[in-house]
């Protein structure tokens, strides 16, 4: 699908931002593993969360709609299970150690770039602790055996999803475990979200310098009812659009004290020069003259595409550091961002771990490729609002991975978008 967007700044109110995909994955898994039923409120079914739900259903859990909420009824399937992870890295990296901790033979598959996304050293650590895995890098990926408690070692600068996956799996193992983190932990807020969700289901992990201590054989306990918080990652696109609009944008349904690392979007927009206001669960952003800044993206990799758009709409040079891991996302996001900016008349360059953007105060029109990457497609849509001519986004359906209603909300805010097959 192509999306053709004509220039026009957005304005108005996002009455309810989509639920946090990161929190949703964790809530679904903890609820499915818990003793007792859980009523989950505030869920929105994007492709990635649907993949996790269907995987847990294959493993024996039942998900029943109740009005706008979902009741999760834990259960176990005997015998081998087949799990389709779609294009969701979280689904793959969370369910893989989970099946092994349960001693459940499984065959995992997926599509797109998922097979080529890294599993090392998670796979190595699992095999050193009782699990057997088939050849990595190709689907189907088969796992059998049972994950043992013990000492695990993971690098902090590869993927926080490896850490989160083991954290959620190891309470189900017999015996206590330790996860030692070597080097600096990047994307630490995602690990904090995991620990926070586990605590709400009665599993407390002790954190010491450079390691996590997990009590085994205790399991999860349902809190009865839980609301999944709003998504700062998804809201970031509307906040960025507000920073381009003199009328501004209002976004509701955000937790200002959230553990989500992408909550930094608000502070970064202030640093660029935009006007921001926040109270309760409501945030307002308006355009003001913006200038280049320096950004450390180590903990906020998902914000880089939309921050690059804001940087291009500002005046002057912006440097975004610690971006190397972006090459291993749904697309090579370093190359994808550079291609997006270039197609819209913006000069930018990147080294191994840094991107430099020469802000020109706006964009030309043009045709851009989403590279089937949801965050590239949504960033391009924000850029189109401040472009000099129409912007065509190829494979714009990629937004469904995390935000199926993105273009519908875009129209409600005054955006002029036409979707073409």
Where are the predicted features?
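Structural preference for solvent-exposed beta-strand-turn elements
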Residues: 1-421
């Amino acid at each position: 699908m192509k999306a053709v967007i004509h220039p026009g700044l957005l304005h108005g109110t996002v009455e309810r931002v989509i639920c946090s995909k990161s929190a949703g994955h964790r809530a679904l898994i903890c609820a499915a593993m818990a003793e007792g039923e859980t009523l989950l409120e505030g869920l929105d079914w994007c492709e990635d969360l649907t993949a996790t739900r269907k995987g847990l259903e294959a493993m024996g859990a039942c998900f029943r709609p109740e009005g706008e909420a979902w009741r999760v009824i834990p259960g176990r399937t005997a015998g081998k299970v087949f799990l389709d992870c779609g294009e969701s890295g979280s689904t793959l990296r969370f369910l893989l150690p989970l099946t092994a901790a349960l001693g459940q033979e499984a065959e995992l598959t997926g599509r797109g770039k998922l097979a080529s996304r890294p599993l090392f050293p998670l796979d190595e650590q699992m095999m050193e602790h009782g699990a057997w895995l088939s050849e990595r890098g190709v689907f189907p990926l088969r796992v059998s055996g049972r994950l043992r408690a013990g000492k695990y070692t993971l690098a902090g600068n590869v993927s926080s999803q490896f850490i989160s996956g083991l954290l959620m799996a190891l309470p189900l193992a017999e015996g206590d475990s330790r996860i030692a983190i070597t080097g600096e932990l990047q994307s630490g807020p995602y690990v904090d979200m995991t620990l926070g969700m586990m605590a709400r289901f009665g599993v407390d992990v002790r954190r010491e310098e450079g390691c996590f201590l997990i009590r085994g054989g205790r399991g999860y306990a349902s809190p009865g009812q839980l609301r999944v918080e709003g998504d700062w990652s998804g809201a970031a696109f509307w906040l960025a659009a507000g920073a381009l609009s003199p009328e501004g944008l209002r976004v509701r349904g955000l937790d200002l004290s959230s553990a989500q690392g992408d909550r930094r979007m608000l502070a970064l927009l202030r640093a660029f020069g935009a006007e921001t206001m926040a109270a309760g669960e409501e945030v307002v952003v308006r355009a003001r003259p913006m200038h280049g800044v320096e950004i450390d993206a180590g903990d906020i990799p998902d914000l880089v595409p939309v921050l690059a758009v804001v940087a291009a709409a500002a005046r002057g040079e912006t440097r975004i550091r610690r971006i190397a891991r972006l090459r291993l996302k749904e697309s090579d996001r370093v190359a994808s961002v550079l291609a997006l900016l270039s197609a819209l008349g913006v000069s930018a360059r990147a080294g191994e771990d840094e991107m430099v953007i020469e802000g020109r105060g706006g964009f030309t029109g043009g045709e851009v490729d989403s590279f089937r990457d949801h965050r590239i497609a949504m960033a391009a849509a924000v850029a189109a609002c401040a472009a000099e001519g129409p912007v065509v986004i190829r494979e714009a359906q990629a937004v469904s991975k995390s935000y199926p209603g993105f273009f519908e909300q875009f129209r409600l805010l005054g955006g002029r978008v036409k979707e073409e097959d």
